């Protein structure tokens, strides 16, 4: 990648726009592609993304575009910030163009039909590409407002990690590296489910002890499931695990938290999602995660409980009561209890 070669950001949402701005602030020319030509034109003219990041000026180095073919041809490093439901359909027709490029997924979701993570879909579409993911406690608006933030880029390709660090690392945005791509990406996808529960708990006025219990048991569930799928449990003690879980489960700026809060206020799921106006990946992830947990026989009572609330008519109070009545287990799965007398 030459100094003047643009970096591509695919997606016109809040996180894609925040990352595009970060790149441009570091002197990197950026082409931000979006499917809606009207959105691209409005962003070009007004230098703002009013639907997703209202009030944040779009850096002059970001060029909103609508031509995907030209964008991919011009860029060797591509950040993919497309909804999980659209990623395959958008990129599969251009598989040949992706050969050899660095593809970094920013999307925290799971494909419903296959239970594949976004980087696995990218790998399937473009097996000759260099694949990575970016994940962590990264609220888009705070990044755009230059709040001090850290993230993780994960890839088996060390040079790709270094390349991402070089273009993204800045005064207010620190980029760490990891080789556990699967664990980092799985942490980012799974925590969205628990943010819905956390938002509901706050709306219903539950105490700090309860919220702390929910977040901690969520981390236990996430780690238990991830290890069953081959991830490193230590990854979940870092930014992409507990870090992302804390911010997503405690901030009203989190989209999945907002959905949970609306549900706790008595809105239907459809009303909660419509009120948000953006994609809340946690709702889609919940369905496939519950099915997968049953398939591989991993104990995930919070996932089962939230599914019962959203799709089976249960209440959060009923789910927590069931959780409290369940047989007590050890606190941390990966610590031996052989020393008990």
Swiss-Prot record:
It is an enzyme of class 1 (oxidoreductase). The keyword Nucleotide-binding applies. GO terms for cellular component: cytosol. It comes from the Bacteria. NADPH binds at residues 14-15, 35, 108, 140, 255, 279, 281. It holds the Pfam family NAD_Gly3P_dh_N. It is found in: Cytoplasm. NCBIfam families: PRK00094.1-2, PRK00094.1-4, PRK00094.2-4. Belongs to the NAD-dependent glycerol-3-phosphate dehydrogenase family. Catalyzes the reduction of the glycolytic intermediate dihydroxyacetone phosphate (DHAP) to sn-glycerol 3-phosphate (G3P), the key precursor for phospholipid synthesis. This is Glycerol-3-phosphate dehydrogenase [NAD(P)+]. It comes from Pseudomonas putida (strain GB-1). The lineage of its organism: Bacteria, Pseudomonadati, Pseudomonadota, Gammaproteobacteria, Pseudomonadales. The gene is gpsA.
């Amino acid at each position: 990648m030459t100094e003047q070669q643009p970096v591509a950001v695919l997606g016109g949402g809040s996180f894609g726009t925040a990352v595009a701005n970060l790149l441009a602030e570091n002197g990197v020319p950026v082409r931000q592609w979006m499917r809606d030509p009207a959105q691209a034109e409005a962003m070009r003219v007004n230098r703002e993304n009013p639907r997703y990041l209202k009030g944040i000026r779009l850096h002059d180095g970001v060029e909103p575009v609508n031509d995907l073919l030209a964008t991919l041809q011009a860029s060797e490093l591509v950040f993919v910030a497309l909804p999980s439901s659209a990623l395959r359909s958008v990129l599969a027709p251009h598989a040949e163009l992706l050969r050899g490029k660095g593809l970094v997924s920013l999307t925290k979701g799971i494909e419903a039909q296959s239970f594949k993570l976004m980087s696995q879909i990218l790998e399937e579409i473009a097996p000759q590409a260099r694949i990575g993911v970016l994940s962590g406690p990264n609220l888009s608006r705070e990044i755009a407002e230059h709040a001090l933030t850290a993230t993780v880029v994960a890839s088996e390709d060390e040079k790709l990690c270094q390349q991402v660090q070089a273009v993204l690392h800045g005064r207010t945005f620190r980029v760490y590296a990891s080789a556990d791509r699967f664990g980092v990406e799985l942490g980012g996808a799974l925590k969205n489910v628990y943010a819905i529960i956390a938002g509901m708990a706050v709306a219903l006025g539950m105490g700090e002890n309860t919220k702390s219990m929910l977040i901690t048991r969520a981390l236990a569930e996430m780690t238990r499931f991830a290890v069953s799928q081959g991830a490193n449990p230590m990854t979940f003690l870092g930014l992409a695990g507990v870090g992302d879980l804390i911010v997503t489960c405690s901030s009203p700026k989190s989209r999945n938290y907002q959905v949970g809060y609306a549900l706790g206020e008595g809105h239907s799921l459809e009303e909660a999602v419509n009120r948000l106006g953006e994609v809340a990946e946690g709702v889609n992830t919940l369905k496939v995660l519950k099915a997968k947990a049953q398939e591989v026989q991993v104990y995930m009572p919070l996932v089962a409980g939230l599914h019962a609330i959203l799709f089976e008519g249960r209440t959060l109070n009923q789910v927590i009561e069931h959780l409290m009545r369940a047989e007590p287990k050890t606190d941390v799965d990966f610590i031996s209890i052989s020393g008990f007398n």
